[in-house]
Amino acid sequence: SFGASAVLGVIGVVSLSKAKTKPQKLFGTIPLLFSIQQLTEGLLWISLRNTDMSNWLPFLTYTFLVFAMAVWPFWIPFTIHKLETDEKRKRLTKVFAWIGAFVAIGVCFILFSYPVKAVTPFCLNCPDAATASLRDHLHYEFAIPTLVKNLIVAFSVLYIAATIVTPFISTIKKMKWLGVVFLASYLFAVIFYTGFVISVWCFFAAILSFVVLWIILDLRKTVPKNTKGT
């Protein structure tokens, strides 16, 4: 987590330095936000293993989950909407930004209404372990009633629509690769890391920071000099 945070921080600084317009700069904050998110989970690991930092557990847990579950469904479509120039697609991406905002508000309400804790559970049936062994990934346990769990499922569908579908809608060259990376990382986490999807998906999804920089570098070629900062 700390290594990823450092790399993502550098990518974020480079992305912002290369961005020419305000929409590009908003888009360029994605790697920095991922950097903060991974730093938070790194500190969460330490607080789980160090009793002196146990008081930080709730703050770090909720901070990570707000990033993972509430920030991205809004920020991804919102920044893509700001970058979009085609009027029809711009209106459509705006709809997904509003969907993301709805998800973010709903998820935050649930997060702060019910207890949640980060754990490193023992795995009894993992293929690489004949006996119980401690997993290298964090699992987040939510103490929520069945009805709310159903809402979480609904929010998950909208989350995927906001973060994965929006990049495919954009007319911006290479933006679809953002959706491809998001989708691939999600499927990878669901298939190979059941029970650790939130933690693992966010770790692998951070790879899209390289795609963000790639897109910004490509957008620089199409921005006239007199539009810098607009």
Set out the residue ranges of the language-model regions.
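Internal transmembrane alpha-helix with an interfacial aromatic "cap," most often the third helix
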Residues: 10-16, 48-49, 53-56, 62-100, ...
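Hydrophobic transmembrane alpha-helical segments in integral membrane proteins
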Residues: 1-10
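Membrane-proximal helix-loop-helix units in multi-pass membrane proteins
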Residues: 70, 80-161
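C-terminal transmembrane-bundle signature of multipass membrane proteins
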Residues: 168-230
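Membrane-interface helix-boundary motifs at transmembrane edges
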Residues: 16-28, 81-95, 168-175, 222-223
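A generic, lipid-embedded transmembrane alpha helix
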Residues: 30-47, 71-73
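Aromatic-anchored segments of alpha-helical transmembrane domains
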Residues: 33-40, 102-109, 181-194
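Juxtamembrane "helix-exit" motif on the non-cytosolic side of transmembrane helices
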Residues: 45-51, 110-117, 189-196
